């Protein structure tokens, strides 16, 4: 049996695999904001990124290791392919963290070996001990992943895992890379690994999975029953293609059905000890932060964090809930941090009151950031009678999107009506050369006119592929949250903004998306799975040194 920590370890990969979602690229400040919130949430491991991908990715992982990693905080992990330069870059990036981990991987399925790596099984059996040993010479905590494990030959998989553990791996990760398996198959795979790998008791078994068939969470729960003790997941289930296993769904399944799962951890069914270290009351806030910063809306019927997760439309259901919530609800909404708290903040509220409420909500802002947030609060309070927690969340989440901006919106004005052509006048500041330019454009509607004017000013080729708007709170004076997604060279970039004027919000969201596009082109990142490991700069060395 694999090493058992006595509970489930939550490995969050929102900042690495989650960021690989189309349009979900994040800047440094956004990654830091999410990392801080993940630490408050109580995750055991934060996979902060893929340091070798680009200087920007390296810097982000390094900064998270420096300011989020701590003796009492989460382990800070970086991803590295089974290559000396990848592993070295990963080590240098995570080095400031007191608790650090190198996560290295190589594919083990025949389809990946033949068509992607162009390597033989013998090649892999040589690379694994060499690269895991090299990583072990740098840090003690080593995670090794057998990419596409669920489609690998089991006997070869056992051999690779045994070699990795012998070479120093302390966690063995079993990915269902393409979301191919069913729960019974995945559970059996974990059971068979426990049974057939002689030294498996020296490592923790981890699982990683994608949601291509909608089975990722179910697969993970079955894996946990069969000995997996680390679950790799993302907030809101974001990730490549159909996404990853959802952190909030996994955690709440283990929380609500604890009496069922306890026996698989050697506990009595009525044991009150939590199965994870997650502070569940932070789930909703974390979900909203990730949604706002990535520009990826949460579907209304999403389990746990969707807008309809605790809503009841049927009269029969409403009657039952009014009499006793347990009739139709298995989770108390307050358990995941969802409440109806409406605070008495308005235009007469002072800086200290706003700071106190933000601190109660878990936000730790610097003096400069607090000043900026308070200025935005006062601006909003002049237009909105009551400021709610959701309004404050929108203010703070939008604020961290401001760094790395080549373009800043200075002024927007629109003219439209049933008998006139929608016309927009937009003034934009270029922060690189400190110039200010104005353009006028006509569109099919006010938002289209604004986007046409911005395109004329920026001259950045793009295609608008999504525009969505939703109300943050109730009331005619509510903030409107706008999400815009644009495409350039088959890559998608998201922008998000909130304002009581949805046209202004749309303008800011479009500018945010354009800024992401501009800075993404400067990063020139590589992909950990799709880019060629045989590039000379990625070449595996025969005698790796520190």
UniProtKB/Swiss-Prot annotation:
Main localization (coarse): cytoplasm
Specify whether Manganese is a keyword of the entry.
yes
Please give the superkingdom of this protein's source.
Bacteria
**So which cofactors does this thing need?**
Mn(2+)
Q: Where is this region: Regulatory domain?
A: 408-546
Name the Gene Ontology biological process terms.
L-leucine biosynthetic process
Q: What class of enzyme is it?
A: transferase
Start and end residues of each Pyruvate carboxyltransferase domain: 8-271
- Localisation: Cytoplasm
- EC assignment: 2.3.3.13
Q: Which PROSITE patterns match?
A: AIPM_HOMOCIT_SYNTH_1, AIPM_HOMOCIT_SYNTH_2, PYR_CT
GO cellular-component term (any): cytoplasm
Q: Name the residues that bind Mn(2+).
A: 17, 208, 210, 244
Q: Which Pfam families does UniProt cross-reference here?
A: HCS_D2, HMGL-like, LeuA_dimer
What is catalysed by this protein?
3-methyl-2-oxobutanoate + acetyl-CoA + H2O = (2S)-2-isopropylmalate + CoA + H(+)
Q: Which UniProt keywords apply?
A: Amino-acid biosynthesis, Branched-chain amino acid biosynthesis, Cytoplasm, Leucine biosynthesis, Manganese, Metal-binding, Transferase
PANTHER family on file: 2-ISOPROPYLMALATE SYNTHASE 1, CHLOROPLASTIC-RELATED, HOMOCITRATE SYNTHASE-RELATED
As for what it does, the entry says: Catalyzes the condensation of the acetyl group of acetyl-CoA with 3-methyl-2-oxobutanoate (2-ketoisovalerate) to form 3-carboxy-3-hydroxy-4-methylpentanoate (2-isopropylmalate).
Q: How does it assemble?
A: Homodimer.
* Family statement drawn from the similarity comment of this UniProt entry: Belongs to the alpha-IPM synthase/homocitrate synthase family. LeuA type 1 subfamily.
The protein here is known as: 2-isopropylmalate synthase
Organism lineage reads as: Bacteria, Bacillati, Cyanobacteriota, Cyanophyceae, Synechococcales
Gene name, per UniProt, is: leuA
């Amino acid at each position: 049996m694999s090493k058992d920590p006595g509970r489930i370890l939550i490995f969050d990969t929102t900042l690495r695999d989650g960021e690989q979602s189309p349009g979900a690229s994040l800047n440094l400040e956004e990654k830091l904001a999410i990392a801080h919130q993940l630490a408050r949430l109580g995750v055991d491991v934060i996979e902060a990124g893929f340091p070798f991908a680009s200087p920007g990715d390296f810097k982000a992982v390094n900064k998270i290791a420096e300011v989020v990693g701590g003796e009492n905080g989460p382990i800070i992990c970086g991803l590295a392919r089974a290559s000396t330069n990848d592993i070295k870059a990963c080590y240098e990036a995570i080095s400031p963290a007191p608790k650090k981990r190198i996560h290295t991987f190589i594919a083990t399925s025949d389809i990946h070996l033949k068509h992607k790596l162009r390597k033989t099984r013998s090649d892999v059996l040589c690379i694994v001990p060499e690269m895991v040993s090299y990583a072990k010479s740098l840090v003690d905590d080593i995670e090794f992943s057998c990419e596409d494990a669920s489609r690998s030959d089991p006997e070869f998989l056992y051999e690779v895992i045994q070699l990795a553990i012998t070479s120093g791996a302390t966690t063995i990760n079993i990915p269902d890379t393409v979301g191919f398996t069913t729960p019974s198959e995945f559970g059996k795979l974990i059971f068979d690994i426990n049974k057939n790998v002689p030294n498996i008791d020296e490592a923790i078994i981890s699982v990683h999975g994608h949601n291509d068939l909608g089975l990722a969470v179910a697969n993970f729960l079955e894996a946990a029953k069969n000995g997996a003790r680390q679950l790799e997941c993302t907030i809101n289930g974001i990730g490549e293609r159909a996404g990853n296993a959802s952190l909030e769904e996994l955690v709440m399944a283990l929380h609500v059905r604890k009496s069922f799962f306890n026996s698989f951890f050697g506990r009595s069914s009525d044991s009150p000890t939590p199965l994870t270290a997650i502070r569940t009351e932070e789930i909703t806030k974390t979900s909203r932060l990730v949604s706002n910063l990535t520009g990826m809306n949460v579907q209304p019927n999403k389990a746990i964090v969707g807008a309809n997760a605790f809503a009841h439309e049927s009269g029969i259901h409403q009657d039952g809930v009014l009499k006793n919530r347990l009739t139709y609800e298995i989770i108390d909404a307050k358990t995941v941090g969802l409440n109806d708290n409406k605070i008495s903040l308005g235009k007469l509220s002072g800086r200290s009151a706003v700071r106190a409420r933000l601190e109660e909500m878990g936000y730790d802002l610097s003096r400069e950031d607090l000043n900026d947030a308070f200025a935005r609060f006062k601006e909003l309070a002049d237009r909105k009678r009551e400021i709610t927690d959701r309004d404050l969340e929108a203010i703070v989440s939008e604020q961290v999107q401001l760094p790395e901006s080549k373009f800043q919106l200075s002024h927007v004005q629109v003219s439209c009506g049933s008998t006139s052509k929608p016309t927009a006048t937009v003034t934009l500041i270029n922060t690189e050369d400190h110039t200010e330019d104005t353009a006028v454009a006509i569109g099919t509607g006010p938002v289209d006119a604004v986007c046409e004017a911005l395109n004329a000013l920026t001259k950045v080729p793009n295609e608008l592929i999504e525009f969505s708007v939703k109300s943050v709170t109730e009331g005619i004076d509510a903030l409107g949250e706008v999400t815009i997604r644009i495409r350039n060279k088959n890559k998608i970039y998201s922008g998000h903004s909130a304002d009581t004027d949805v046209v202004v919000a749309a303008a800011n969201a479009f500018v945010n998306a354009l800024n992401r596009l501009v800075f993404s082109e400067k990063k020139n990142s590589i992909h950990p799975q799709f880019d060629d490991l045989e590039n000379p700069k990625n070449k595996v060395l025969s005698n790796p040194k520190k």
